[in-house]
């Protein structure tokens, strides 16, 4: 991936914009999770109820250290054994990010990805980004850049070109406290 594309995406994120980008299985919408206006824009674009919350993704485990360091060692070990990879973990939220990210929950969903583009992007950005499937409510998630543009047109500030990793379904979601699978 050209450094120019990554820098353009970082610029969009830094100024509170919304980005579309490829992930492991589907195209995603993302933004700076500390920018409430950007998080709200994503919810509006998707027509997604705020109560559901959103996932944060990064390519660097250290971006989640302030969340992981609060966990018992056994929970932390269980999480780290699945990363990087397509497993999202729900952990207690200390209120670090925009409240809309956690929705009506007292926890936040986080994932460390192995997708090379997202790894490069979050490293350059210096933190995690919001990651939610690129689709309006009730529609199938976009699996191509064309589908993503068709859904959102100019509602997205930047479309980061790239390829999906080839997984057939979005990430599994698990509860860190219980280990329960919340989404298969």
Curated annotation (Swiss-Prot):
UniProt catalytic activity: L-threonine + hydrogencarbonate + ATP = L-threonylcarbamoyladenylate + diphosphate + H2O
Keywords: ATP-binding, Cytoplasm, Nucleotide-binding, Nucleotidyltransferase, Transferase, tRNA processing
One annotated GO biological process: regulation of translational fidelity
One annotated GO molecular function: ATP binding
Principal location: cytoplasm
Protein EC: 2.7.7.87
Residues in the signal sequence: none
Cell compartments where the protein resides: Cytoplasm
Domain YrdC-like: 3-184
Entry-linked InterPro entries: DHBP_synth_RibB-like_a/b_dom, Sua5-like_dom, TC-AMP_synthase, TC-AMP_synthase_SUA5
GO cellular-component term (any): cytoplasm
Keyword ATP-binding found: yes
Any Pfam family matching the protein: Sua5_yciO_yrdC
Record function comment: Required for the formation of a threonylcarbamoyl group on adenosine at position 37 (t(6)A37) in tRNAs that read codons beginning with adenine. Catalyzes the conversion of L-threonine, HCO(3)(-)/CO(2) and ATP to give threonylcarbamoyl-AMP (TC-AMP) as the acyladenylate intermediate, with the release of diphosphate.
Family named by the database record: Belongs to the SUA5 family. TsaC subfamily.
HAMAP family in UniProt: TsaC
Name of the protein in its database record: Threonylcarbamoyl-AMP synthase
Gene this protein is translated from: tsaC
């Amino acid at each position: 991936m050209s450094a120019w594309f990554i820098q353009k995406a970082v610029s969009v994120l830094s100024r509170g914009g919304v980005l579309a980008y490829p992930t492991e299985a589907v195209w995603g919408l993302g933004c700076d999770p500390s920018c409430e206006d950007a998080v709200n824009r994503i919810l509006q674009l998707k027509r997604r109820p705020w109560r559901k919350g959103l996932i944060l993704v990064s390519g660097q485990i250290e971006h989640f250290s302030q969340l992981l360091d609060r966990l018992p060692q056994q929970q932390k070990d269980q999480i780290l054994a699945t990363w990087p990879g397509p497993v999202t973990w729900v952990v207690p939220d200390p209120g670090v990010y925009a409240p809309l990210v956690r929705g009506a929950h007292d926890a936040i969903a986080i994932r460390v990805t192995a997708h090379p583009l997202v790894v490069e992007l979050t490293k350059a950005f210096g933190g995690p980004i919001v990651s939610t499937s690129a689709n309006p409510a009730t529609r199938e998630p976009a699996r191509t850049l064309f589908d993503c543009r068709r859904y959102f047109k100019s509602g997205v500030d930047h479309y980061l070109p790239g390829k999906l990793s080839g997984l057939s379904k979005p990430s599994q979601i698990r509860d860190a406290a219980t280990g329960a699978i919340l989404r298969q």
